[in-house]
């Protein structure tokens, strides 16, 4: 053993020097730990006695398999780094003489240590494992040579020994010199590959004098072991489910609601008489198992279970807190009549809820005032329903609908017929929809008006919602809503609806105004500003016909010169006959220009204005007095005519023509 330690230490020292020549500094203790790890993961490596690139790469494959199997926490940090450094040394051993000498000495040490381990170790401890795949802890994977010199105690191994029981006197054991070492490499590599089938035959012994070893056990395949664990877990889950079902059944027996038939039918199955489209509720027996998969609509108060004998049992469960929490959050954030809140209410109301359940749910979700409003509307709806039931003669009175009087207990309400549950649902949801919106200043339809930039569809939605609260249903006042949809719309939407107002319905209004948005409003405001009008006046005057009326026919659209009626009337007038004035042509008398008649007698001039020419200045002034004195120095008196005397006024009439 001491000789082995000295040779091993000398080899490690030479390897350290060889690495140092390549500029790599390593610690002596780290190299010792590395080769201890090599011996633990590759027990076949020291026994071959040859170091070449092929075997060293096989060592690297063993490292990788060990890493994939046990994880990084079982592999030293420097294992792969040292493996790469030694691989480079082996690749270049022909170039560096020092490296070649170190490799040769290492091969000699491996051969010597291989034969020494086979002859000495079994004599010292016959129960010592020869080939070990892994240990329980990282420090016990394979002790170094120094640790073996100090302590030879046996360490527990996780995997069994890969040897079969044999005797030293077996005549079939071959000579170590005749062993095919290359073939053994492939067989030993199979020990670490989980994809290979279990190796059940023993490998050829390296030494004929090897004592007997424990019996070989096959290496457990990790996949098979994992499948066994999964099967065990599945069986455990099934047993736990059956255990929970039996506990639930026992609790129901104590309350006197059900009878037990057998473990197979202990859970029973949920059956609820339902109409088409109704969600079938689930029983409480599976609540603990499906708690993580439940949604608010999967937990309902009243359910009906049928046992193995075909007998139906009804039982009542309390509301799940997730339902109340979700509905409370929706009512607080979005409002009691918001679409999301109503969707949750309808989802819960699709199943069997007693009047007490409705009262509990509303009191927990809504405020005090809203709860009272809902309760008053609910009672009013129940009175109307009770009157119809009385006329139909089905016996479902007001006390049954409201859960009062003889039907105030939960046990009595659980026995209701499915049709009665449907009437309670309709009355409760109708009362919920009539709850007022917070911040709404009264439910007045005339006060609902479209904003300047509000889409027309949103405005109609607000109008229909308000009408539904007032009339109970928007269909009841659809004509009134249509009228207000036009009158309370903004000017742009009114202008778009006006030509088709009496030709389409409310959906047509929405389609006509679908393209009217902020950009349209902005362009319309700019056009009205440029024309100096308001938006409303601009839209009202935009389609009016331009131009005045015709002065001849009084109609719009043309002028008098283009009047077709005047031209048509002129074409129908009679032709003039013989002129009564001159008796010489066919023309009208007012158009006659003759001076004499057909006999040659002079004709008097036309009376009246007639056709007058340009007025002319008189050639002689009558009755005018010259106030300009006669003076030779007057520049305006240039003619050598004698001055006129003052004339008196005369009675001569003015000339007829100028």
Swiss-Prot record:
Record's compositionally biased regions (Basic and acidic residues): 138-149
Residue positions of covalent lipid attachment, annotated as N-myristoyl glycine: 2
Family matches, as SMART domains: ZnF_C2HC (SM00343)
GO cellular component, as recorded: viral nucleocapsid
Biased composition (Polar residues): 113-126
Propeptide: 101-162
UniProt keyword annotation of Zinc present: yes
Motif placement: PTAP/PSAP motif: 211-214
UniProt keyword terms in alphabetical order: Capsid protein, Cleavage on pair of basic residues, Coiled coil, Host-virus interaction, Lipoprotein, Metal-binding, Myristate, Phosphoprotein, Repeat, Viral budding, Viral budding via the host ESCRT complexes, Viral matrix protein, Viral nucleoprotein, Viral release from host cell, Virion, Zinc, Zinc-finger
One Pfam short name: Gag_p24_C
Zn-finger (CCHC-type) residues: 548-565, 577-594
GO BP terms in the entry: viral budding via host ESCRT complex; viral translational frameshifting
Matches recorded under InterPro entries: B_retro_matrix (IPR003322), B_retro_matrix_sf (IPR038124), Gag_p24_C (IPR045345), Primate_lentivir_Gag_pol-like (IPR050195), Retrov_capsid_C (IPR008916), Retrov_capsid_N (IPR008919), Retrovr_matrix (IPR010999), Znf_CCHC (IPR001878)
Protein name as catalogued: Gag polyprotein
Gene transcribed to yield this protein: gag
């Amino acid at each position: 053993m001491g000789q082995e330690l000295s040779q091993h230490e000398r080899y490690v020292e030479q390897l350290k020097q060889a690495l140092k020549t390549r500029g790599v500094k390593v610690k002596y203790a780290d190299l010792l730990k590395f080769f201890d790890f090599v011996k633990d993961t590759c027990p076949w490596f020291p026994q071959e006695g040859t170091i070449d690139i092929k075997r060293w790469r096989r060592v690297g494959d063993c490292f990788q398999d060990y890493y994939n199997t046990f994880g990084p926490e079982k592999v030293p940090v420097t294992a792969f780094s040292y493996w790469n450094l030694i691989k480079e040394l082996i690749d270049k051993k022909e170039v560096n003489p020092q490296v070649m000498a170190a490799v040769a000495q290492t091969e000699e040490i491996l051969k010597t240590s291989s034969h020494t381990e086979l002859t000495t170790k079994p004599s010292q401890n016959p129960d010592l494992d020869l080939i070990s795949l892994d240990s329980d802890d990282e420090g016990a994977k394979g002790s170094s040579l120094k640790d073996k010199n100090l302590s030879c105690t046996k360490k527990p191994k996780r995997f069994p020994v890969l040897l079969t029981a044999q005797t030293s006197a077996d005549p079939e054991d071959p000579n170590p010199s005749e062993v095919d070492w290359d073939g053994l490499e492939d067989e030993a590599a199979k020990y670490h590959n989980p994809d290979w089938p279990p190796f059940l035959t023993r490998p050829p012994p390296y030494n004929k004098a090897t004592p007997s070893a424990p019996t070989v056990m096959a290496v457990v395949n990790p996949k098979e072991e994992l499948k066994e664990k999964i099967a065990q877990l599945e069986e455990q889950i099934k047993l736990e489910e059956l255990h929970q079902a039996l506990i639930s059944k026992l609790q129901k027996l104590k309350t006197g609601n059900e009878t037990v038939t057998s473990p197979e039918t202990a859970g029973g199955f949920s059956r609820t008489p339902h109409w088409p489209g109704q969600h079938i509720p689930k029983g409480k027996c599976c609540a603990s198992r499906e708690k993580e998969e439940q949604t608010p609509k999967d937990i309902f108060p009243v359910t009906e279970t049928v046992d193995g004998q075909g007998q139906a049992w009804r039982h009542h469960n309390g509301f799940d807190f997730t339902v109340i929490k979700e509905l409370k959050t929706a009512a607080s954030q979005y409002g009691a009549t918001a679409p999301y809140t109503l969707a949750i209410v309808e989802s819960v109301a699709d199943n069997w809820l007693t009047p007490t359940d409705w009262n509990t749910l509303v009191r927990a979700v809504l405020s005090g005032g809203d709860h009272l409003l809902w309760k008053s509307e609910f009672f009013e709806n129940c009175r109307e329903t009770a009157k119809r039931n009385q006329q139909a003669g089905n016996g479902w009175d007001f006390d049954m609908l409201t859960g009062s009087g003889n039907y105030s207990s939960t046990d009595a309400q659980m026995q209701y017929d499915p049709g009665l549950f449907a009437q309670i649902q309709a009355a409760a949801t109708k009362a919920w929809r009539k709850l007022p919106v917070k911040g709404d200043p009264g439910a007045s339809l005339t006060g609902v008006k479209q904003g300047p930039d509000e889409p027309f569809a949103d405005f109609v939605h607000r109008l229909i919602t308000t009408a539904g609260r007032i009339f109970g249903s928007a269909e009841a006042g659809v004509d009134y809503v249509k009228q207000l949809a036009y009158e309370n719309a903004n000017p742009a939407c009114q202008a778009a609806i006006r030509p088709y107002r009496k030709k389409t319905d409310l959906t047509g209004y929405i389609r006509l105004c679908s393209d009217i948005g902020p950009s349209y409003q902005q362009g319309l405001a700019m056009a009205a500003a440029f024309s100096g009008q308001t938006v409303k006046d601009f839209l009202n005057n935009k389609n009016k016909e331009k131009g005045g009326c015709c002065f001849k026919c009084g109609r719009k659209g043309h002028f008098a010169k283009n009047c077709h009626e005047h031209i048509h009337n002129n074409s129908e007038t009679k032709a003039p006959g013989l002129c009564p004035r001159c008796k010489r042509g066919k023309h009208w008398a007012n158009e006659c220009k003759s001076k004499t008649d057909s006999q040659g007698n002079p004709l008097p001039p036309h009376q009246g204005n007639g056709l007058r020419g340009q007025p002319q200045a008189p050639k002689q002034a009558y009755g005018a007095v010259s106030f300009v004195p006669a003076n030779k120095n007057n520049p305006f008196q240039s003619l050598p005519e004698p001055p006129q005397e003052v004339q008196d006024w005369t009675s001569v009439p003015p000339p007829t023509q100028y």
